[in-house]
């Protein structure tokens, strides 16, 4: 009797085991078929792109049409991305290889994340999953200056930020968020706001109350004075560094000012430079103040990196009316937000690369280029400021971070 029961149990166990193995096998086969269908779909979509746009040449040979030359597209799928490589062989399709962003994006139904170009090919990288949009609260939890989940940079690497965008582009909101992020690393802040607007009243006055020094500068003469003082501070820092080589040289490398314990960055934010120019040019004295200010701004852009002084300039349009070409080339980070991305001239003035199919963006979205980090302009969504955010509490927290860093050296709020 015991033998029969044991046999029955073993038999039932075997049946159950075979059942689950069969289910697993069918699921695996189904997954493989779906994966193959997906890959075939990519291949088909790329072939359709080539044929429908006639990116090929053909000849009739022995009454049959044969392909003699075509744009070569290769692709590779990774866990997170689809990479499409447009090959460059020096033929008639060579220049076309770098202008396929919009077509490939439509063919794959994915947003273009990044484009890189070499002598032999242009690589288009399409993330398979949408990048998580950060909130203002998220950005105070990072040591880097952060724009999105995958886009950020360390202070000074590279230095200086040029931010452009029309009205209702989200430019001022991003400036406010960047100010909070700079406070988060202990930076001293100077806000140069010729419009005497939101940046002054919502952020500047709050910082003056909490930090205990002058933050807001509005008139052309105040702005010129702030830039003059920044250049003076830069030169003082350089002199201190020169007088103390043992402190500022380590392992054959010259340290920046803020690399040394007890030293902190200085950040100059100039919002709406055209408004500064317009107001300054109403008087002779104002014109002189403006010329001095622009000279000092140029000095800071060229020389201040080692002194840990950073400049952020906000504009509606990065035209040479305010920012000459030689100045624009010294901004390591360039951001263009909102509907301005539909203006090719604005894109050309902001970014070094012109081989991008820029799309028209909404509030808080646009393109970014970072020297040494993101070589080609990339679509981004800036940190989201919700209606429920307690603005006062948020900047209190940013100021608390500022004082927490400085308290390590015996300073106090």
Predicted regions and their residues:
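Generic recognition of flexible, low-complexity loop/linker segments
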Residues: 253-258, 299-300
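A generic structural signal for short, non-catalytic loop/turn and secondary-structure boundary residues
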Residues: 156, 261, 330, 361, ...
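Short basic/glycine-enriched coil/helix segment immediately N-terminal to the Walker B
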Residues: 257-266
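Intrinsic-disorder detector for long, low-complexity, phosphorylation-rich regulatory segments
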Residues: 247-250
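Basic- and hydrophobic-enriched, low-structure N-terminal and domain-boundary segments
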Residues: 1-160
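Phosphate-binding and hydrolysis-coupling loops of NTP-dependent motor/remodeling domains
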Residues: 61-90, 103, 109-127, 337-413
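P-loop NTPase catalytic phosphate-binding loop
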Residues: 1-34, 81, 133-243, 266-267, ...
């Amino acid at each position: 009797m015991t033998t029969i029961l044991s046999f029955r149990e073993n038999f039932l166990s075997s049946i159950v085991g075979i059942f689950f193995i069969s289910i697993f096998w069918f699921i695996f086969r189904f997954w493989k078929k779906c994966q193959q269908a997906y890959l075939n779909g990519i291949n088909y979509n790329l072939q359709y792109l080539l044929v429908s746009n006639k990116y090929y040449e053909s000849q009739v040979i022995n009454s049959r049409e044969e392909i003699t030359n075509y744009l070569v597209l290769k692709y590779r799928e990774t866990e997170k991305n689809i990479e499409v490589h447009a090959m460059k062989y020096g033929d008639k399709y060579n220049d076309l290889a770098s202008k396929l962003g919009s077509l490939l994006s439509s063919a794959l139904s994915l947003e273009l994340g990044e484009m890189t170009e070499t002598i032999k090919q242009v690589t288009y990288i399409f993330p398979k999953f949408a990048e998580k949009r950060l909130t203002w609260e998220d950005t105070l939890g990072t040591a880097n200056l952060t724009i999105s989940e995958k886009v950020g940079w360390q202070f000074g690497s590279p230095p200086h930020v040029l931010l452009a965008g029309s009205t209702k582009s989200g430019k001022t909101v991003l400036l406010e968020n960047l100010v909070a992020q700079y406070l988060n690393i202990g930076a001293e802040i100077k806000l140069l706001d010729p419009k005497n607007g939101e940046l002054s009243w919502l952020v500047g006055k709050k910082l003056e109350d909490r930090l205990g020094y002058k933050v807001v500068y509005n008139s052309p003469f105040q702005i010129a004075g702030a830039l003059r003082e920044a250049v003076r501070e830069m030169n003082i820092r350089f002199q201190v560094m020169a007088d103390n080589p043992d402190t500022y040289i380590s392992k054959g490398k010259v340290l920046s000012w803020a690399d040394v314990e007890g030293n902190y960055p200085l950040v100059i934010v100039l919002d709406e430079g055209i408004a500064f120019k317009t107001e300054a040019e109403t008087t002779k004295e104002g014109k002189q103040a403006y010329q001095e200010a622009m000279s000092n701004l140029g000095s800071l852009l060229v020389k201040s990196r080692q002194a840990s002084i950073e400049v952020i300039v906000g504009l509606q349009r990065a035209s040479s009316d305010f920012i000459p070409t030689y100045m624009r080339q010294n901004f390591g980070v360039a951001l263009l937000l909102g509907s301005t991305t539909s203006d090719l001239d604005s894109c050309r003035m902001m970014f070094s690369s012109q081989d991008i199919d820029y799309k028209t963006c909404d509030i808080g979205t646009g393109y970014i280029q970072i020297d040494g980090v993101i070589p080609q302009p990339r679509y981004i969504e800036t940190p989201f400021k919700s209606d429920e955010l307690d603005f006062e509490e948020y900047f209190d927290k940013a100021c608390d971070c500022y004082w927490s860093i400085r308290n390590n050296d015996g300073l106090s709020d």
